[in-house]
């Protein structure tokens, strides 16, 4: 703001000089001394006005500083009152926290006493549970010994198992052979894929070479365009340089103007130095006031530091309380762990009891199946064909086939139910923390058992005259010639007609004429034959 006023004053001086010059021109009678006196008067008059303006401005600043000093004093007094109130509040809160800490210590002592009492009670319960577990363990060991003695009677079942294992080995050999064929097939496929990859790589290299040649052609065509662009850029640079030179000339002119203004400012600086000395004296007084304020601020900082120390003490007390609470929580977690261990032990005892009952049921079922199978085998072995007439051999074969089918159904149901139960029990017994290798072994064994069951289920009963050594062909029923049927009996003619319509042998209607024998129940749905006893088969539980 000050330089603008001075520029106005310079303009006024120039106008006054012009007026004086005009007066000189108009009044030629006045002497030059009177003109100089008038000019000095005007100059001093303007200087006095300038100084009066400055004095008014400094007076306003002094009033503003006085108002600010009053405000600072009021704020300082308010801060002192706030400090007193804060100290009183902190003292009250500290007393409250001390009371709370004493209450918490009392509660902690009571909790420790209760914890010790609960610990003693749980230890007594643990001892009782261990005693009960030992008793149940002894009972289970005795029962296992009794079951081991009973298992010695299953030697005949072991022989049948050996026969099944031999069949299983034959199937495994067949499976290995098929695996070898599959590996050869995979090798051929991999070889073919490698050859295809080489062919594709060669094609890609050829395409890359073609693209490179095309790129070179395009690059040669673009060289002319780049030179034209460089010429245009040079023209633009020359134009910019001309503009910069013009701007330099303008800056030199402005520099000369600034030098003229600098001389004027030097004159004003001399005038301001006097005022600076006056302001320095005032600043000394202000510095004394500032020192007083700094001492008061230091006192306030000391008060705040004391308050922070009190806060730190409170924080430490809160940390101690938190550590005590954490110790209490750890004790509770230990108690919960002991409870969980008790539950797990009880669950394991129940599981062992359930497994024992399942094993007993399975063994009873196997015994019943074995007794039924032995009775069926005895009946089959005791059957004897009557050799009086050739027609009775058909009935004997039908009866024998029925009994063999019943025996096969009985044994297959037992074989299917037993592995399913074993698999279910094995899945229940598997712990959650098994390694990956053991899980893979268990999965492979399950898959092998499932494949064996599927193979057993696909086995079909043999038809009479078909032992299964030769693969079956499509049955094409060719009607017999009447010339071939003439020498045959009535019974054989009816049997051939039935065979043309069905794949299995059913009793013909002509057999009902004979009164010397009776067919079995599944074919005639009448009374049981006197020669062959059909055993009652009990249902096998799943």
UniProtKB/Swiss-Prot annotation:
<keyword id="KW-0597">Phosphoprotein</keyword>
<feature type="region of interest" description="Disordered">
    <location>
        <begin position="1"/>
        <end position="32"/>
    </location>
</feature>
<dbReference type="InterPro" id="IPR038844">
    <property type="entry name" value="CFAP157"/>
</dbReference>
<keyword id="KW-0744">Spermatogenesis</keyword>
<protein>
    <recommendedName>
        <fullName>Cilia- and flagella-associated protein 157</fullName>
    </recommendedName>
</protein>
<keyword id="KW-0175">Coiled coil</keyword>
<keyword id="KW-0963">Cytoplasm</keyword>
<feature type="coiled-coil region">
    <location>
        <begin position="250"/>
        <end position="370"/>
    </location>
</feature>
<comment type="subunit">
    <text>Interacts with TUBB and TUBA4A. Interacts with CEP350.</text>
</comment>
<feature type="modified residue" description="Phosphothreonine">
    <location>
        <position position="31"/>
    </location>
</feature>
<dbReference type="GO" id="GO:0008017">
    <property type="term" value="F:microtubule binding"/>
</dbReference>
<comment type="function">
    <text>Specifically required during spermatogenesis for flagellum morphogenesis and sperm motility. May be required to suppress the formation of supernumerary axonemes and ensure a correct ultrastructure.</text>
</comment>
<keyword id="KW-0969">Cilium</keyword>
<dbReference type="GO" id="GO:0005737">
    <property type="term" value="C:cytoplasm"/>
</dbReference>
<dbReference type="GO" id="GO:0036064">
    <property type="term" value="C:ciliary basal body"/>
</dbReference>
<comment type="similarity">
    <text>Belongs to the CFAP157 family.</text>
</comment>
<feature type="compositionally biased region" description="Basic and acidic residues">
    <location>
        <begin position="10"/>
        <end position="27"/>
    </location>
</feature>
<keyword id="KW-0221">Differentiation</keyword>
<feature type="coiled-coil region">
    <location>
        <begin position="33"/>
        <end position="192"/>
    </location>
</feature>
<dbReference type="GO" id="GO:0007288">
    <property type="term" value="P:sperm axoneme assembly"/>
</dbReference>
<keyword id="KW-0206">Cytoskeleton</keyword>
<keyword id="KW-0966">Cell projection</keyword>
């Amino acid at each position: 703001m000050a330089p603008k006023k001075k520029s106005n004053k310079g303009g006024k001086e120039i106008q006054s000089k012009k007026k004086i010059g005009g007066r000189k021109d108009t009044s030629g009678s006045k002497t030059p001394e009177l003109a100089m006196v008038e000019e000095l008067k005007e100059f001093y008059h303007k200087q006095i006005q300038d100084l009066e303006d400055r004095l008014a401005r400094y007076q306003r600043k002094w009033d503003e500083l006085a108002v600010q000093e009053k405000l600072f004093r009021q704020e300082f007094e308010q801060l002192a009152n706030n400090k007193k109130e804060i100290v009183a509040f902190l003292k009250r809160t500290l007393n409250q926290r001390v009371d709370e800490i004493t209450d918490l210590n009392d509660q902690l002592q009571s909790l420790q006493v209760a914890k010790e009492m609960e610990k003693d009670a749980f230890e007594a319960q643990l001892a009782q549970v261990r005693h009960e577990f030992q008793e149940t363990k002894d009972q289970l060991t005795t029962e296992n010994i009794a079951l081991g003695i009973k298992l010695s009677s299953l030697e005949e079942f072991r022989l049948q198992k050996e026969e099944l294992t031999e069949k299983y080995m034959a199937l495994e050999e067949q499976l290995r052979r098929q695996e070898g064929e599959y590996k050869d097939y995979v090798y051929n496929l991999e070889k073919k894929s490698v050859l295809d990859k080489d062919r594709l790589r060669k094609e890609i290299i050829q395409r890359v070479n073609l693209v490179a040649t095309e790129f070179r052609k395009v690059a040669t065509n673009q060289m002319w365009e780049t030179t034209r662009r460089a010429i245009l850029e040079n023209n633009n640079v020359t134009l910019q340089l001309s503009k910069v030179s013009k701007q330099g000339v303008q800056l030199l002119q402005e520099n000369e103007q600034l030098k003229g203004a600098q001389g004027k400012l030097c004159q004003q600086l001399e005038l301001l130095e006097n005022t600076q000395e006056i302001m320095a004296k005032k600043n000394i007084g202000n510095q004394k006031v500032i020192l007083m304020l700094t001492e008061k601020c230091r006192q306030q900082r000391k008060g705040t530091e004391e308050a922070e120390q009190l806060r730190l003490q409170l924080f430490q007390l809160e940390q101690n309380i938190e550590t005590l609470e954490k110790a209490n929580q750890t004790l509770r977690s230990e108690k919960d762990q002991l409870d969980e261990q008790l539950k797990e032990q009880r669950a394991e005892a129940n599981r062992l009891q359930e497994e024992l009952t399942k094993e007993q049921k399975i063994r009873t079922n196997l015994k019943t199946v074995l007794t039924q199978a032995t009775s069926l085998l005895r009946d089959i072995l005791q059957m004897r064909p009557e050799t009086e007439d050739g027609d009775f051999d058909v009935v004997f074969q039908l009866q024998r086939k029925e009994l063999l089918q019943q025996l096969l159904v009985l044994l297959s149901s037992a074989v299917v139910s037993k592995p399913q139960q074993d698999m279910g029990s094995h899945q229940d017994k598997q712990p959650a923390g098994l390694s990956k290798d053991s899980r893979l072994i268990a999965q492979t064994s399950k898959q092998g058992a499932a494949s064996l069951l599927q193979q057993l289920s696909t086995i079909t009963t043999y038809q009479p005259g078909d032992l299964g050594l030769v693969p079956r062909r499509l049955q094409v029923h060719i009607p017999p010639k009447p010339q071939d049927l003439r020498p045959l009996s009535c019974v054989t003619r009816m049997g051939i007609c039935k065979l043309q319509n069905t794949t299995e042998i059913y009793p013909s209607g002509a057999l009902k004429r004979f009164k010397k024998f009776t067919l079995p129940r599944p074919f005639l749905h009448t009374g049981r034959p006197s020669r062959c006893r059909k055993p009652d088969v009990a249902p096998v539980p799943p």
